[in-house]
């Protein structure tokens, strides 16, 4: 099986979308001999920040000498990004071999698995074969009925910032969404919670009581920023001082506090993580596509934020890191997102918009988005391709200007390739 054949097979079931339920993934893993049962996990859910939190925890565990798996979604440039061990993506050969082995098993069960279930099974098989000491695993959507929740009790169940997203599936209130996400908390694990509303916290507390899990609420009162620049941030948290984080934005400090609380939990559970491991691991973390600088002249930043909380964080980052800088905004968006919110918060900082079409069937075309954006009274230029949009944005910004690309994670891979 070639890489194209493997990816075609995996993506061929994507028309099913994301179907909650553990029956299909359980049946498939049973035929595979349950590789997930040989692994230990840190299981991470939330509306925003879960990928960044996963990256921080995994970076520290790797620094501590553990063979650390990392499972996240979506990818930015290459599919293989979704599963990594100690920072190395799965190879094409390994991806093809495991997919070829799993294909007849998946085809033989009562209902074909969804794309996300297939990818999850492939990742678990790879992590088990490579004998990972621990896997940091990001939930796909929700928690209780997400394919990743087929695992047993994790070392830590981490609930990052909870907001209103995927409401048609997860529920239309924060409490309903929290109830679904708290389904990853199981008997015998420790739960870590990003502080939230009283209603959300009550839901999580109830779940912990029901299953007998210890709950650790992140104490953001101990979080203090010392300094920040486009090179990173220096902060204190929980008795640790002068920690360096290369990821930008106040929201990333909150994610770091969640990661540090999780690492404290792991230390108490017997994982050998030193203070130097924590400092070095945090200082070396990478997480692409989140207010990330990909070019310096002009300054070119990309951000994958696409829901109201992410856009609020982006607007704050613009104020903190790019004050009084006129922005050439390169953008594309999916039609089912709240793109009105996306642009209201950023339009005042823009001198012009350049629109492109993300590589996704749900995307607004560049022309459709341009028609909407003219209402902000700024020049708008639709482009036929992402590469054309990148060239135009760089040209219009000039070497001393600033380009901000945001609107959809599905846009960023093509932008990175075009800039390179």
Where are these regions (language model features)?
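Active-site-proximal loop/hinge segments that shape catalytic or ion-binding/gating pockets
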Residues: 408
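ATP-dependent carboxylate-amine ligase catalytic core
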Residues: 22, 26-37, 63-152, 170, ...
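C-terminal helical cap/extension that packs against the catalytic core
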Residues: 197-207, 211-216, 231, 299-302, ...
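Nucleotide phosphate-binding/pyrophosphate-handling subdomain across enzymes
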Residues: 38, 134-137, 145-158, 162-163, ...
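N-terminal leader/targeting and accessory segments in enzymes
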Residues: 1-48, 52-67, 76-77, 190-193, ...
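Beta-strand->loop->alpha-helix junctions that form or flank phosphate-binding loops
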Residues: 194-195, 207-229, 246-250, 278-284, ...
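Short, high-confidence coil segments that cap the C-terminus of an alpha-helix
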Residues: 131-133, 324, 398-400
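Acidic, Mg2+-coordinating active-site environments of NTP-dependent enzymes
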Residues: 111, 118, 131-138, 154-242, ...
């Amino acid at each position: 099986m070639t890489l194209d054949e493997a990816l075609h097979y995996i993506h061929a079931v994507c028309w099913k979308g994301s179907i909650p339920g553990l029956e299909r993934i359980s049946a498939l893993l049973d035929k595979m001999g349950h590789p997930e049962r040989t692994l230990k996990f840190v299981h991470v859910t939330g509306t925003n920040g879960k990928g960044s939190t996963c990256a921080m925890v995994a970076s520290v565990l790797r620094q501590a000498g553990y063979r650390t798996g990392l499972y996240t979604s979506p990818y930015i440039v290459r599919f293989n990004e979704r599963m990594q061990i100690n920072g190395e993506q799965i190879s094409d050969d390994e991806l093809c071999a495991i997919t070829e082995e799993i294909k007849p098993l998946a085809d033989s069960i009562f209902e074909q698995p969804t794309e996300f279930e297939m990818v999850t099974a492939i990742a678990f098989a790879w992590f088990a074969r490579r004998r990972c000491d621990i896997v940091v695993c990001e939930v796909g959507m929700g928690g209780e009925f997400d394919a990743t929740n087929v695992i047993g009790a994790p070392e830590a169940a981490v609930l990052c910032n909870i907001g209103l997203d995927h409401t048609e599936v997860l529920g239309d209130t924060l409490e309903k969404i929290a109830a679904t996400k708290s389904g990853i908390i199981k008997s015998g694990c420790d739960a870590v919670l990003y502080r939230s509303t009283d209603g959300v916290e009550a839901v999580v507390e109830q779940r912990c009581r029901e299953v007998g899990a210890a709950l650790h609420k992140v104490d953001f009162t101990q979080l203090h920023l010392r300094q920040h620049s486009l090179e990173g941030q220096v902060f204190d948290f929980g008795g640790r001082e002068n920690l360096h984080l290369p990821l930008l934005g106040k929201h990333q400090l909150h994610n770091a506090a969640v990661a540090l609380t999780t690492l404290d939990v792991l230390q108490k559970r017997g994982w050998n993580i030193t203070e130097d491991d924590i400092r070095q691991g945090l200082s070396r973390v990478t997480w692409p596509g989140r207010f990330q600088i990909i070019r310096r002249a002009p300054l070119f930043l990309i951000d994958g934020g696409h829901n109201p909380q992410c856009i609020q964080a982006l607007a704050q980052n613009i104020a903190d890191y790019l004050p009084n800088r006129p922005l050439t905004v390169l953008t594309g968006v999916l039609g089912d997102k709240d793109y009105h919110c996306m642009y209201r918060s950023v339009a005042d900082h823009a001198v012009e918009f350049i629109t492109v079409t993300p590589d996704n069937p749900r995307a607004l075309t560049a022309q459709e988005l341009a028609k909407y954006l003219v209402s902000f009274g700024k020049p708008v230029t639709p482009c036929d391709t992402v590469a054309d949009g990148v060239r135009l944005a760089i040209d219009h910004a000039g070497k001393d200007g600033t380009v901000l690309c945001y609107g959809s994670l599905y846009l960023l891979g093509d932008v990175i390739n075009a800039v390179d």
